[in-house]
Amino acid sequence: FAARGTRPAAPLLEWCAGKGHLGRRLAQADGVAVTSLEIDPALCAAGAALAARADIRQTMLCADALAGDAQAHLRGREVVALHACGELHRTLVRSASRSGAAGYRIAPCCYHLGAGDAYRPLSAGATLALNTDTLRLAVTETVTAPQHVRRRLARDQAWKLGFVALRDAVEGGNDGAPPAPRSFRPVPAAWLTGDFAGFCGALAQREGVVLPEVTQGQWAYWQAQGERRRLEVRRHELVRHAFRRALEAWLVLDLALGLEERSFDVEAGTFCERRLTPRNLLVLARR
């Protein structure tokens, strides 16, 4: 990310900076002053200490990026936003014509956050109607997760689906029809550290489901049912996920066109390989 784009001709503003790691890297590489905007006072304090220790020209600015007065900090600066989530990157584009920023370097992330019930396009010609669930699809993948994490996530999903299968069998009507589908709240991680029977028992107690006496062999059956359902869900997901990258590309191009319509010269591309982060799309904009 730091290597993409030309050397900045203006001071930098790091948007949603955390501890300001990116800002310090850019200040060191480009020899420019950096202001790092972050809402969390603890992160601001930690960033200021790191900048002082490294003797780098970096100012930590504790402010809310979504507040109206935050736009005043953009004037005359080039804005860098690495994985600013949802409305945090969209607000930069919406205010671009009046913010007075010299340029933008934006790698968007978590497109669904702050979108409300429906996505509001950033460019005039965009007409695709997207709801929150569709936006979430753009970031639903585990490219960077280690193999053992993927196995654990698959097992957790199978256990949850196994419980649903057991619950549906217990609560089915006399006509044999399954009950209406319903979800349940996230489960504590500790419930997933034991065995399948213990997991189902704890979840049933919380959900008010009265389970019959279940033998060890029957637990194995319901666990296998969960795995079967997981594989079925996986097949359906493969169809949906075929559109994932295209959807994300559309969202990034909407961002790029939004900046172009606000009188910026714009480029869009990638800044790293997807194995480092699947959110590797970048928009560069200069006056």
Model-derived regions: residue spans:
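Class I S-adenosyl-L-methionine
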Residues: 66, 70-287
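Conserved class I S-adenosyl-L-methionine
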Residues: 9-16
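Conserved SAM-binding loop
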Residues: 47-48
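Conserved SAM-binding loop of SAM-dependent methyltransferases across substrates and taxa
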Residues: 20-31
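Conserved SAM-binding strand-loop segment of SAM-dependent methyltransferases
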Residues: 55-65
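Conserved SAM-binding motif I beta-strand of class I
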Residues: 33-38
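Conserved alpha-helix/loop element of class I SAM-dependent methyltransferases that forms part
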Residues: 2-8
